Amino acid sequence: MAEERFPGWHGTTILAVRRGGEVVVAGDGQVSLGQTVIKGTARKVRRLSPGGHEVVAGFAGSTADAFTLLERLEKKLEAAPGQLARACVELAKDWRMDKYLRNLEAMLIVTDGETLLVLTGAGDVLEPEHDVTAIGSGGNFALAAARGLMATELPAEEIARKAMAIAADICVYTNGNLTVERISK
């Protein structure tokens, strides 16, 4: 999506792993323009606390668009405290139907430590089947690595870090400078 309006912008891998009563969300810090790394320390994973209920969100795509969506999500969560799935469905409906929001180019992974969801501009609110999900340019690499590591006894954070390291080794738009947030219910 972002490549249509901004053909040279690339970057971001966000991965979420749910295991042992917690969810870990990890994101790399690289932002690239064409073949140039513009920034290596961007924070694409955020902790939100609307109405005192903690949520962790990671985003891929346009940063400004993602922040707009995160602000909207916070408002939806304030209107439906502790109901992450409901708030995400309401946001997805707005995102799909509102003329302004429809043009936003970002994807989100959100979790409250129990529920884990991916939100897309197509109106999708998806819950992963295997307690692992990923978005962004290196998302498929991180997802494959994490799915393989889920067969081990490693804790969620270690799975996330190892999978992100593998993605960073393969995807030129992903680096090893991670932001990692943990949340449990």
Curated annotation (Swiss-Prot):
InterPro entries referenced in this protein's UniProt entry, alphabetically: ATP-dep_Prtase_HsIV_su (IPR022281), Ntn_hydrolases_N (IPR029055), Proteasome_sua/b (IPR001353), Proteasome_suB-type (IPR023333)
Main localization (coarse): cytoplasm
Enzyme class per UniProt = hydrolase
- Return the Gene3D superfamilies for the record: Glutamine Phosphoribosylpyrophosphate, subunit 1, domain 1 (3.60.20.10)
**EC number in record:** 3.4.25.2
Question: Which residues bind Na(+) per the record?
Answer: A168, C171, T174
Q: Which GO terms describe its cellular component?
A: HslUV protease complex; proteasome core complex
Q: Name the CDD domains on file.
A: protease_HslV
The record, for Pfam families, names: Proteasome
Gene Ontology biological process terms from the UniProt entry? proteolysis involved in protein catabolic process
One GO MF annotation is: metal ion binding
Activity control, as annotated, is: Allosterically activated by HslU binding.
Q: Which keywords does the record carry? A: Allosteric enzyme, Cytoplasm, Hydrolase, Metal-binding, Protease, Sodium, Threonine protease
Q: Which reaction does it catalyse?
A: ATP-dependent cleavage of peptide bonds with broad specificity
**Family recorded in the similarity comment:** Belongs to the peptidase T1B family. HslV subfamily.
Name the job this protein performs: Protease subunit of a proteasome-like degradation complex believed to be a general protein degrading machinery.
| Subunit structure and binding partners | A double ring-shaped homohexamer of HslV is capped on each side by a ring-shaped HslU homohexamer. The assembly of the HslU/HslV complex is dependent on binding of ATP.
Name this protein carries in UniProt? ATP-dependent protease subunit HslV
Organism the protein comes from: Cereibacter sphaeroides (strain KD131 / KCTC 12085)
